[in-house]
Amino acid sequence: MKRLAVVAVVTLVMLGCTASGDHTPVTGPVTVQAAGKKADAPREMKAFVSEQELRNYLRELAEREKKQRPAQISGAVGMDKLAPSAPMSAKSEAMAGSAPDANESVTNVQHAGVDEGGIVKVHGDQLVVLRRGRLFTVEIGGDELTPISMVDAYGPDIDPRGTWYDEMLVSQNTVVVIGYSYERGGTEVGMFHIDGAGKLAFRATYHLRSNDYYSSRNYAGRLIGNKLIFYSPLYVNPWSEDPFQSFPAVRKWHKGATPGEFKRIEPAARAYRPAYPFDVAYGTALHTVTTCDLSSGDFDCTATSVVGPPGRVFYVSPRAVYVWVTGGAYVGEKMRARSMVYRMPLDGSSPSAVGVSGSPVDQFSFLESEDGYLNVLVRSNDVGDGMWGAENSRGGVKLLRMPVSSFSDGSEPVDESSYLKLPTPGGYTFENRFVGDYLLYGTGSGWGYPQARGKATLYAVRWASGDVHRVPLAHGIDRIEQMGSDAVVVGVDGADLHFSAVRLEGTPQEVCDYVRKNASQGEMRSHGFFYKPQDRDSGMLGLPISVPGRPGYYNLFQNSAAILFLRNRGLRFEEVGELGAQPEKAKDDGCRASCVDWYGNAQPLFVHGRVIALLGYELVEGEVEDGVIHETRRVNYAPRNLTASREWDESGVPN
């Protein structure tokens, strides 16, 4: 389904939502039993030994699908429907920590050292910006704030219509633009060279077979060192004359390129099947992790796939990609569980799996913790985070905590004792985040119209012990972010925007509620926020803001009014001020592609000791004096208006 068509549907759904919740009482601490599976259970999933075996398996799935089509089907699997299995092993393996990134980052990532595709990155003394189908570089070395280079975010022989150029990553002298092409079919990867002076040059375009990866919360690409990582579902037609035509493959684009030029990058030996059967009534997907080595400057890729139902949420830790698939159904009157989580190691070793129930809300529902456990918040009626799936999260809430060592071939489900029943919040749009030793969650307005709730509850769960705390707030919960060793919760109460500082040491509690009158969030995605710590107890945060009462989905079509900066001093907020946009000076940019800001258009940048606001085509720099930020200059890097000026110097600065 094309994205613009989905926007209208999602908007109608959001306008029609009402608050609900059963307010489940707090339960005791989660207990993980020892001994996980049969002693002789395989530790990994089974790969296909030949192309013929894989073909036969797909034919079997086709026959099963044919038999199930007449059956009554319902969408999600209840979390309480899995039969308990033998207890799990308490053995855990040592986990790699989230090592800090050696390079300065301007991206609010989930794990340090695991970069995520975004709209702005740092390359040495340059900012690289992806905006509306074009790439831009801006010099920030020394005292500079000067546009340098601009190129289309696609090849010179490509018609960009029907393609969304969504996100970007930078590895040494390579800029990678990730998009999805409805015209050419699949993930489109543009590779560009960037030199030390920030000059951009197109290198090549490649296509990866995939279905649309878009998620309102997640990001398609990750970068760990020089390793580029993609997740994508590939929906398989087992009835096809050639079922392999939808398998992972790469094509280097050139004018006149044909589908026959795709070259498979995954042999049968890198395709895996779970021992635990799944329902094929909703179809079959190859959940594919593609890894590309960028160290040579080429696009050398390999892929690994696991077969499963189509609903999914994926999460990337420093060690593995986790893919949670959901495809449960009623057959007659009997509920059968068909949820599973796959673990696909980044070192290239074989995937493993385990049967589970329910579904996470989004990638922030996961944490692979240092003690060798996978911790996941699940809801009973979720179907994954594809498109706007995360905005329609429903059902009871549980915390799954299981040893990573309990993954095997998928033949056994997780023991019921590994799930902790949690309170279900009232409200609509569900937000969750692991911060320090706690899982935090609650509900807010999300992409809909701001609600005047007056009060809400933030639930704080100590994931290792299961202790649950309720933190009352005077506003909804639309954003949960880490702030040092504590958290900041952002949300609206009608026309006002609130920032609540939550102390997590000892008993979690709200310390400060800073209210920005007559404002709303200008960005909904995680990358719109950034916190720059100064020391353990202080720092500065930035967040795009907009006019009061603006629904969240408006950020797809309207720019933010400003970026608001707050100083944190011991969990007490002080307003530093804002750097604002000048929309009256905007000019037609001649946009040809990606003319909707699916991934946002504003972001605070704390870089090279400077404070800069990215606001559409404007970069606005500020200087903090006596606790107040003052604009010092702005540059408009738009393709038809490459001008710069200092507030104190009307003569301007030459490009």
Where does each model-flagged region fall?
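Short amphipathic alpha-helical "recognition" segments used for binding
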Residues: 6-7, 120
